Amino acid sequence: MSCVNIRGCCIGEGRPKVIIPIVEPTETAVLEKAAEFSTLRADCVEWRIDCFEGAKDLPTIVHCAAKLRVALKDKLLLFTFRTKAEGGKAALAHEEYLHFIRTVLATDCADLIDIEFFTVGAELPALIEDAHTAGAAVVCSSHDFHKTPPRAELVSRMVAMQQAGANLPKLAVMPQSRADVLELLAATAEMADRHPETPIITMSMGALGAVSRLSGEALGSAMTFANPGQASAPGQVSLDIVNEVLDALHL
């Protein structure tokens, strides 16, 4: 698997890199969490802007982003607006979403930016190129909170993300059975073995899928989300346990 190197952090090499989310509603609370998270054992902080009271107030987001970048010190910063259609807290029209992405990129604060695969559609390659021009790596994401598609579909979706130029294809799906968890893990291993051009991020959500958040080094998922006190998705494991298990399973 190839490596994405950001600020000296090699995503796709060795132990999966740990992401912790900020889901606070106000600028003051966001910055307080950032100061706290800057000292924790995690590689990357995700700002879930859809959870922010000013989620559609772009000048406020730009102002807060600059302060957040400073507060996090050397942590990687991932910007995410998770739309309601993909399980988030707020909705954006198509053009609003594109404008949001480009506004965040213009801040020069993003180490990584989440771009939703289905939300952007045909404009994905151009938007990814914009991100790369701005110096940001792209997490291209797809979420299914109802089911786990077949393995072949999961793989083809991640390959399409790669072909569009994404640095880190990401899939999060909901299992309805143990077989669904295995389907996601098999798709992850197949991608890592047969399409190693980029690292990938995968997870099976909920308690049933929690094992997928901890087995990335062995099976091919390069990053995992951990809960530092408040989860941003079903099945996130606490940060302390994630670190303990990743250490125990380190190859």
Which residues fall in each region the model found?
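Active-site beta->alpha loop and helix N-cap motifs at the rims of alpha/beta catalytic domains
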Residues: 2-3, 13-133, 143-147
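Catalytic alpha/beta core domains of metabolic enzymes, predominantly
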Residues: 112, 117-251
